[in-house]
């Protein structure tokens, strides 16, 4: 591993958001899927009936709901805490890291990425304004450019070492 890219990442503990609790507590229905998509995206223009239907259909495939609901049963704060890494372990990361986050993210609070950027010595943080949890969708071109440039720098550095 030469570099890390983190997008709307947990990594550190935080009080569970209403949005994350709703995502982890998802019970399949088309209406619930529409509400969840509202939580994921700042740009509501991206939220089409077709997208909601497609995601809903994926969520009702045999075995999906049973597996998903077993991952994060209530009370869910414990799962946020379990997904958090020890701060000393995070500080010890030697890798250059790109952290990407939507300012209006209702699933993972921006404060989580700010904390990661504070802990990781070689971190870069990019915050997308007017953006929810779907940074890779809501700002696709800029997201791809940032990630590609960041990873290509590592490839160029590695090629220079050989």
Explain the meaning of each model-derived region.
Residues 122-162:
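Catalytic active-site module of serine/aspartate enzymes centered on a nucleophile-bearing elbow/loop
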Residues 93, 99-101, 105:
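Short beta-strand/loop motif that positions the catalytic acidic residue
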Residues 68, 72, 116, 143, ...:
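Hydrophobic "lid"/C-terminal helical patch
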Residues 114-123:
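Active-site-adjacent alpha-helix of alpha/beta-hydrolase-fold enzymes
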Residues 106-112:
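Conserved alpha/beta-hydrolase "acid-adjacent" motif
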Residues 2-35:
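Flexible "cap/lid" loop of the alpha/beta hydrolase fold
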Residues 27-91:
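Conserved alpha/beta-hydrolase catalytic His-Asp/Glu region
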Residues 1, 94-95, 122:
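Active-site acidic short loop of glycosyltransferases
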